[in-house]
């Protein structure tokens, strides 16, 4: 039972790390990356549809995204969605594809992005700490019910703390890598 608590906690912590990685992937770091458009949705026949489900997104050059819609009639809608988004990019529509040139980031914008990265990382750390708290509460319930001894409680508590420390170390590493990518000129 207590091993289940540990494995569930580890799984949840890994999911928090993966969520952070996905979230940071959508932050523009000066290089073209198809995941920049992951959060972008377009109104398609009355339903909000992600751009990556209605178009092929490729990276022909280091600072360019090429969006080729499967249905050419939706090209204008995708263009409007990009202009309305907080990406700060201006699409170039040539009738069949959209080209997104990704400009160099200014020093000021880089600092804003680093702040955003740190905020996302802190949210991930809070999630991991909440998972630790939940695991410790479950272990205390098990001890109270007589399923594990007090010594087991302490031992499993230490294991949960090790998982937490490892997860936070991974989050710090992910964050550091993203910050380096953003600050790279």
From Swiss-Prot:
One GO biological process term: translation
Keyword Protein biosynthesis (UniProt): yes
GO molecular-function terms, A-Z: ribosomal large subunit binding
A GO cellular component entry from the record: cytoplasm
Pfam families: RRF
Protein's UniProt keywords contain Protein biosynthesis: yes
UniProt similarity note: Belongs to the RRF family.
Function comment: Responsible for the release of ribosomes from messenger RNA at the termination of protein biosynthesis. May increase the efficiency of translation by recycling ribosomes from one round of translation to another.
Protein name according to UniProt: Ribosome-recycling factor
């Amino acid at each position: 039972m207590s091993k289940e608590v540990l494995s569930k906690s580890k799984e949840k912590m890994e999911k928090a790390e993966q969520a952070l990685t996905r979230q940071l992937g959508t932050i523009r770091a000066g290089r073209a990356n198809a995941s920049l458009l992951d959060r972008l949705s377009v109104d398609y026949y009355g339903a909000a549809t992600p751009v990556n489900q209605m178009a092929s997104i490729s990276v022909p050059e280091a600072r360019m995204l090429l969006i080729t819609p499967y249905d050419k009639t939706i090209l204008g809608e995708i263009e409007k969605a990009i202009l309305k988004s907080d990406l700060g990019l201006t699409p170039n529509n040539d009738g069949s594809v959209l080209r997104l040139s990704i400009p160099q980031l200014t020093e000021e914008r880089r600092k804003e992005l680093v702040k955003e990265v740190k905020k996302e990382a802190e949210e991930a750390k809070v999630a991991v700490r909440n998972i630790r708290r939940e695991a410790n509460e479950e272990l205390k319930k098990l001890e109270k019910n007589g399923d594990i001894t007090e010594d087991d409680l302490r031992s499993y508590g230490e294991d949960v703390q090790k998982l937490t420390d490892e997860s936070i170390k991974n989050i710090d590493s992910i964050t550091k890598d993203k910050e380096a990518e953003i600050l790279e000129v």
